[in-house]
């Protein structure tokens, strides 16, 4: 299943790598290098999944996660980070999935697939 994905990461090579890989799978990927206009971007793009880096140069991804949850309760958010330690942070619980960054995107792809499937079934029920 293809999805509209919004990828938020301040590292250019990650944006390029993930964007390329996910687009190759048929997804429609938009990227943001900063958390600055995230909420506006979500409103404009209406993504089905947000892939969010926890440590952005200008924002704390966990705070952005709370903002997303306030405005878009059912939008699946996949936290992506190079730091495994965040898994034990209470604030990450609000995310649907937690993926440790790697050049192997299989974990991320599985999370995206699950997010689409779960969210699809939710929106059909309502």
Model segments located where?
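Acidic catalytic/metal-coordinating carboxylates
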Residues: 34, 60-63
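Short amphipathic alpha-helix used as the core "switch/output" element in two-component signaling
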Residues: 40, 62-73
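The feature encodes the CheY-like receiver
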Residues: 15, 57
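Alpha4 helix (beta4-alpha4-beta5 surface) of REC/receiver domains from two-component response regulators
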Residues: 63, 83-101, 106-110
């Amino acid at each position: 299943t293809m999805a509209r994905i919004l990828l938020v990461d301040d590292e250019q090579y990650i944006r390029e790598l993930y964007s390329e890989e996910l687009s190759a799978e048929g997804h429609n990927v938009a990227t943001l290098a900063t958390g600055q206009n995230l909420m506006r971007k979500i409103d404009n793009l209406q993504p089905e999944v947000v892939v969010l880096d926890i440590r952005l140069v200008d924002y704390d991804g966990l705070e952005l996660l709370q903002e997303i949850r306030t405005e878009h309760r059912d939008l699946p958010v996949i936290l992506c980070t190079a730091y495994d330690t965040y898994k034990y942070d209470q604030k990450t619980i609000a995310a649907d999935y937690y993926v440790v960054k790697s050049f192997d995107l299989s974990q991320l792809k599985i999370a995206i697939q699950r997010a689409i499937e779960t969210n699809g079934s939710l929106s059909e029920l309502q």
